[in-house]
Regions:
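Cationic, beta-structured binding surfaces that engage anionic biopolymers and membranes
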Residues: 65-73, 87
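Compact beta-sheet-dominated domain cores in extracellular/mature segments
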Residues: 17-19, 24-27, 43, 49-60, ...
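Short, ordered beta-strand-loop transition motifs
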Residues: 28-34, 78-85
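Acidic/polar N-terminal loop/beta-strand segments that form early-domain functional surfaces
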Residues: 40
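Fungal secretory targeting signals
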Residues: 1-19
Length: 235
Protein backbone atom coordinates (compact mmCIF):
# COMPACT_ATOMS: atom_id res chain seq x y z
CA UNK A 1 0.00 0.00 0.00
CA UNK A 2 1.31 3.43 -0.93
CA UNK A 3 0.23 6.73 0.51
CA UNK A 4 1.40 10.11 -0.69
CA UNK A 5 3.25 12.70 1.38
CA UNK A 6 5.08 12.41 4.68
CA UNK A 7 3.48 9.99 7.13
CA UNK A 8 2.50 11.22 10.55
CA UNK A 9 2.40 8.66 13.35
CA UNK A 10 -0.87 8.31 15.24
CA UNK A 11 -1.91 5.78 17.82
CA UNK A 12 -4.17 3.05 16.46
CA UNK A 13 -6.86 3.89 18.99
CA UNK A 14 -7.23 7.37 17.51
CA UNK A 15 -7.98 5.88 14.10
CA UNK A 16 -10.22 3.03 15.16
CA UNK A 17 -13.38 5.12 14.95
CA UNK A 18 -13.34 5.42 11.15
CA UNK A 19 -16.52 3.76 9.84
CA UNK A 20 -16.75 4.65 6.17
CA UNK A 21 -17.19 7.68 3.97
CA UNK A 22 -20.55 7.73 2.18
CA UNK A 23 -22.55 9.56 4.86
CA UNK A 24 -19.95 12.14 5.90
CA UNK A 25 -17.99 12.89 2.71
CA UNK A 26 -19.15 14.95 -0.27
CA UNK A 27 -18.46 15.12 -4.01
CA UNK A 28 -17.94 11.35 -4.09
CA UNK A 29 -17.14 10.04 -7.56
CA UNK A 30 -15.24 7.47 -9.60
CA UNK A 31 -12.83 9.01 -12.13
CA UNK A 32 -10.59 6.72 -14.21
CA UNK A 33 -10.79 3.98 -11.52
CA UNK A 34 -9.97 6.46 -8.75
CA UNK A 35 -12.42 6.91 -5.88
CA UNK A 36 -12.44 10.64 -5.07
CA UNK A 37 -14.19 12.43 -2.20
CA UNK A 38 -13.97 15.49 0.02
CA UNK A 39 -14.10 14.46 3.67
CA UNK A 40 -14.17 16.29 7.02
CA UNK A 41 -11.02 16.22 9.13
CA UNK A 42 -12.84 16.55 12.43
CA UNK A 43 -11.17 19.92 12.98
CA UNK A 44 -13.63 22.08 11.08
CA UNK A 45 -12.13 21.77 7.61
CA UNK A 46 -12.03 19.13 4.88
CA UNK A 47 -9.60 17.39 2.52
CA UNK A 48 -10.09 16.05 -1.00
CA UNK A 49 -8.32 12.73 -1.49
CA UNK A 50 -8.40 9.58 -3.61
CA UNK A 51 -7.98 5.80 -3.62
CA UNK A 52 -6.78 3.97 -6.74
CA UNK A 53 -9.33 1.15 -6.88
CA UNK A 54 -7.54 -0.69 -9.67
CA UNK A 55 -4.82 -1.55 -7.14
CA UNK A 56 -7.37 -2.68 -4.54
CA UNK A 57 -9.99 -4.74 -6.41
CA UNK A 58 -10.08 -7.79 -8.68
CA UNK A 59 -12.59 -9.58 -10.88
CA UNK A 60 -12.94 -13.23 -9.91
CA UNK A 61 -15.04 -14.84 -12.66
CA UNK A 62 -17.54 -12.02 -12.70
CA UNK A 63 -17.42 -11.09 -9.03
CA UNK A 64 -15.75 -7.98 -7.64
CA UNK A 65 -13.54 -8.63 -4.62
CA UNK A 66 -10.64 -7.23 -2.64
CA UNK A 67 -7.14 -8.01 -3.89
CA UNK A 68 -3.88 -6.07 -3.84
CA UNK A 69 -2.93 -5.17 -7.43
CA UNK A 70 -6.08 -6.92 -8.64
CA UNK A 71 -6.54 -4.70 -11.75
CA UNK A 72 -10.29 -5.20 -12.01
CA UNK A 73 -10.42 -2.61 -14.80
CA UNK A 74 -8.87 -5.11 -17.22
CA UNK A 75 -12.05 -7.18 -17.25
CA UNK A 76 -14.84 -4.96 -15.89
CA UNK A 77 -16.78 -2.17 -17.57
CA UNK A 78 -19.73 0.21 -17.18
CA UNK A 79 -18.95 0.78 -13.49
CA UNK A 80 -21.15 3.09 -11.41
CA UNK A 81 -21.10 4.27 -7.81
CA UNK A 82 -24.18 4.56 -5.58
CA UNK A 83 -23.17 5.77 -2.15
CA UNK A 84 -20.41 3.35 -1.22
CA UNK A 85 -21.55 0.56 -3.56
CA UNK A 86 -19.52 0.01 -6.73
CA UNK A 87 -21.40 -1.85 -9.47
CA UNK A 88 -19.80 -3.15 -12.67
CA UNK A 89 -20.28 -5.54 -15.55
CA UNK A 90 -17.40 -8.03 -15.23
CA UNK A 91 -16.19 -10.85 -17.47
CA UNK A 92 -17.03 -14.46 -16.68
CA UNK A 93 -15.68 -17.65 -18.21
CA UNK A 94 -18.98 -18.71 -19.81
CA UNK A 95 -21.72 -17.09 -21.86
CA UNK A 96 -23.02 -14.47 -21.49
CA UNK A 97 -19.51 -13.09 -21.22
CA UNK A 98 -20.33 -10.43 -18.58
CA UNK A 99 -22.39 -10.40 -15.42
CA UNK A 100 -23.48 -7.68 -12.99
CA UNK A 101 -21.59 -7.51 -9.71
CA UNK A 102 -21.43 -5.10 -6.78
CA UNK A 103 -19.12 -4.44 -3.84
CA UNK A 104 -19.47 -2.28 -0.74
CA UNK A 105 -16.31 -0.15 -0.72
CA UNK A 106 -16.82 0.70 2.95
CA UNK A 107 -15.72 -2.83 3.81
CA UNK A 108 -12.15 -1.54 3.56
CA UNK A 109 -12.20 2.19 2.70
CA UNK A 110 -12.99 4.92 5.20
CA UNK A 111 -12.41 8.56 6.07
CA UNK A 112 -9.43 8.96 8.36
CA UNK A 113 -9.27 12.59 9.49
CA UNK A 114 -10.09 13.81 5.99
CA UNK A 115 -8.18 11.19 4.03
CA UNK A 116 -9.77 8.29 2.16
CA UNK A 117 -7.62 5.26 3.00
CA UNK A 118 -7.88 1.50 2.47
CA UNK A 119 -7.33 -0.82 5.43
CA UNK A 120 -7.45 -4.08 3.48
CA UNK A 121 -3.86 -4.98 4.40
CA UNK A 122 -4.21 -4.06 8.07
CA UNK A 123 -5.37 -1.44 10.53
CA UNK A 124 -4.56 2.18 9.73
CA UNK A 125 -2.07 3.49 12.29
CA UNK A 126 -0.64 6.41 10.27
CA UNK A 127 -2.18 8.95 7.95
CA UNK A 128 -0.48 11.20 5.40
CA UNK A 129 -0.12 14.92 5.71
CA UNK A 130 -2.31 16.98 3.39
CA UNK A 131 -0.74 17.50 -0.04
CA UNK A 132 -0.75 20.96 -1.58
CA UNK A 133 -1.37 19.40 -5.02
CA UNK A 134 -5.05 19.22 -5.97
CA UNK A 135 -6.63 15.90 -6.94
CA UNK A 136 -6.85 15.93 -10.76
CA UNK A 137 -10.14 16.24 -12.59
CA UNK A 138 -8.56 14.04 -15.29
CA UNK A 139 -5.87 11.50 -14.39
CA UNK A 140 -4.59 10.91 -17.94
CA UNK A 141 -1.24 12.35 -18.99
CA UNK A 142 0.46 11.94 -22.37
CA UNK A 143 4.11 11.94 -23.36
CA UNK A 144 4.81 12.35 -27.07
CA UNK A 145 8.28 10.85 -27.47
CA UNK A 146 10.95 11.47 -30.10
CA UNK A 147 13.45 8.72 -30.93
CA UNK A 148 15.80 10.88 -32.99
CA UNK A 149 16.89 14.49 -32.82
CA UNK A 150 15.71 17.19 -30.46
CA UNK A 151 12.52 18.37 -32.19
CA UNK A 152 9.26 17.39 -30.48
CA UNK A 153 7.42 18.06 -33.74
CA UNK A 154 8.90 14.74 -34.94
CA UNK A 155 7.65 12.53 -32.13
CA UNK A 156 6.82 9.01 -33.26
CA UNK A 157 5.65 7.38 -30.02
CA UNK A 158 2.78 8.46 -27.75
CA UNK A 159 2.80 7.12 -24.19
CA UNK A 160 -0.37 7.49 -22.12
CA UNK A 161 -0.20 7.14 -18.34
CA UNK A 162 -2.96 7.17 -15.75
CA UNK A 163 -1.77 4.50 -13.31
CA UNK A 164 0.87 4.83 -10.60
CA UNK A 165 3.88 2.75 -11.64
CA UNK A 166 7.40 2.16 -10.36
CA UNK A 167 8.70 1.50 -13.86
CA UNK A 168 7.14 1.28 -17.32
CA UNK A 169 8.54 0.95 -20.81
CA UNK A 170 7.13 0.06 -24.20
CA UNK A 171 8.24 -3.50 -24.90
CA UNK A 172 8.38 -4.21 -28.63
CA UNK A 173 11.14 -6.80 -28.35
CA UNK A 174 13.83 -4.26 -29.20
CA UNK A 175 15.39 -1.44 -27.22
CA UNK A 176 13.72 1.92 -27.85
CA UNK A 177 15.57 5.04 -26.76
CA UNK A 178 13.97 8.47 -26.55
CA UNK A 179 15.73 11.76 -27.09
CA UNK A 180 12.98 14.28 -26.29
CA UNK A 181 9.39 14.46 -25.02
CA UNK A 182 6.36 16.73 -25.11
CA UNK A 183 4.09 16.32 -22.09
CA UNK A 184 0.39 17.27 -22.08
CA UNK A 185 -2.41 17.22 -19.49
CA UNK A 186 -0.33 16.48 -16.38
CA UNK A 187 -2.49 17.67 -13.47
CA UNK A 188 -0.39 16.36 -10.60
CA UNK A 189 1.91 13.47 -11.53
CA UNK A 190 5.63 13.24 -10.94
CA UNK A 191 6.96 11.38 -13.98
CA UNK A 192 10.62 10.39 -13.86
CA UNK A 193 12.56 9.37 -16.98
CA UNK A 194 15.30 6.72 -16.72
CA UNK A 195 18.09 5.55 -19.00
CA UNK A 196 17.32 1.83 -18.56
CA UNK A 197 14.21 -0.38 -18.66
CA UNK A 198 14.57 -1.33 -14.97
CA UNK A 199 14.49 2.32 -13.81
CA UNK A 200 17.69 1.79 -11.82
CA UNK A 201 19.70 4.60 -13.43
CA UNK A 202 19.93 8.07 -11.98
CA UNK A 203 16.86 10.08 -13.01
CA UNK A 204 17.42 11.71 -16.39
CA UNK A 205 14.51 14.13 -16.06
CA UNK A 206 11.58 14.66 -13.69
CA UNK A 207 8.35 15.96 -15.24
CA UNK A 208 5.74 17.91 -13.30
CA UNK A 209 2.69 19.90 -14.34
CA UNK A 210 5.02 22.84 -15.00
CA UNK A 211 6.36 20.97 -18.05
CA UNK A 212 3.02 20.77 -19.87
CA UNK A 213 3.23 21.72 -23.55
CA UNK A 214 7.00 22.26 -23.39
CA UNK A 215 9.51 20.24 -25.41
CA UNK A 216 12.02 18.60 -23.07
CA UNK A 217 15.30 17.43 -24.61
CA UNK A 218 16.98 14.71 -22.54
CA UNK A 219 20.68 15.04 -21.76
CA UNK A 220 21.01 11.31 -22.48
CA UNK A 221 18.64 8.81 -24.04
CA UNK A 222 15.70 7.53 -22.01
CA UNK A 223 14.06 4.07 -22.04
CA UNK A 224 11.51 3.96 -19.19
CA UNK A 225 9.39 6.04 -16.83
CA UNK A 226 7.90 5.96 -13.35
CA UNK A 227 4.66 7.76 -12.41
CA UNK A 228 3.86 8.88 -8.86
CA UNK A 229 0.80 10.85 -7.69
CA UNK A 230 1.67 14.06 -5.84
CA UNK A 231 -1.89 14.67 -4.61
CA UNK A 232 -3.60 12.96 -1.67
CA UNK A 233 -3.63 9.37 -2.89
CA UNK A 234 -3.77 5.83 -1.54
CA UNK A 235 -2.54 3.53 -4.29
Amino acid sequence: MHRSSVLLGLCSAALAAAQGFSTECSDISIIDYWLVATCPTGSGDSITSSVFLNAKLANSNGNLGWAEDGYYARSCQDCTLDGATLSCECEIASLPSYQSTSLNLEEHIANYEGHLLSNQTGAITTIPSDSTVAVPSDFDVTLALATTGTACERTGVSLGLNNPTDCYYINLGVTIEYTAALQTDNQGWEIVAYADTECTSDPIYTFSSDDNDSCVVFNETVQAFSATPLWNADY
